[in-house]
Amino acid sequence: GIILGIVAGITYHIKVIPFIVFLAIVIALFLQKERWYQKCILLLMMCLTLGGVIQCIGVYSDQYAEDCFGITDAIKDEWEYPLTHWIMMGLNEKSDGGYMQEDVAYTATFETRKERTEENVRVILARLRCFGAADYIQFIFFDKMPRTWGDSCFAGDDYLFRMPYLPECPLVQIMKWNGTSHSYCLIYTWTYYVILFFGIVLSGLLALGHRGRQDPMMIGRIAMIGIALFQILWECNSRYVITFLPMMILMALDGYFTCKQRLTQAD
């Protein structure tokens, strides 16, 4: 529990998205019916360690930033964007809930973090009212989710197009989205992507009704639901999924190997 809390605390400061895995571990822990007393003790240890690590790193990093780079609280208040900014961008129809430079420029027009937060909240509520329930659901499933999960290159070809390194290199022409040979890249990545997701779905289906074998991969399934919910609420981008690729590969392998095992037993 202590080790997990330390790792989660460090992860929180590096990048918040993988922190979803820590939350998935906690949820999976409580979905198990046995050993409630031990689970409560373990959770308490994790939370105390997590809180301590986050606080310690936060204090040290703030002091380091001020001493080495002159980044004071006043500078942060002037330039730092609140979390509400990315939620606001996630509701922009023009970008299908993705990054929007207009929103970035708009948030930057306000002088303090408090003003930016209040204005972001106002825009968020206004955009939700404009959607309505039915249109918002349609926006999620037909705009945001395809923009998130419908890119087999995880936006890598787009970023390479923006800042190409050795643009005339044959490999770059294969990888960037407007390259002369990019179709070969798409054939490979989409084949891999479909096989990957088919294995993940297979793993979930084969786990139904078999609780005994479900537990090892339960954390991965909960984390996948978590990242999907995160992308719905946040500014969506397919590159956020890259962090979870190792876990997705393990889940796909579980699906294929379990299927093979079941077929072997049936014979």
Region locations from a protein language model:
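Transmembrane alpha-helix segments characteristic
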Residues: 3-8, 212-231
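Membrane-proximal stem/loop segments at transmembrane-domain junctions that anchor or position
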Residues: 63-169
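Membrane-interface alpha helices of multi-pass inner-membrane proteins
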Residues: 1-15, 25-27, 46-54, 228-229
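A juxtamembrane structural motif centered on a specific transmembrane helix
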Residues: 205-217, 249-267
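Membrane-interface anchor segments at the N-terminal boundary of transmembrane helices
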Residues: 140-220
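Hydrophobic/aromatic-rich transmembrane helices and adjacent perimembrane loops
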Residues: 8-27, 192-193, 237-257
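Perimembrane helix-loop-helix junctions
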Residues: 21-52, 250, 258, 262
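Transmembrane-helix signature of polytopic, lipid-linked glycan biosynthesis machinery
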Residues: 10-12, 58, 224-238
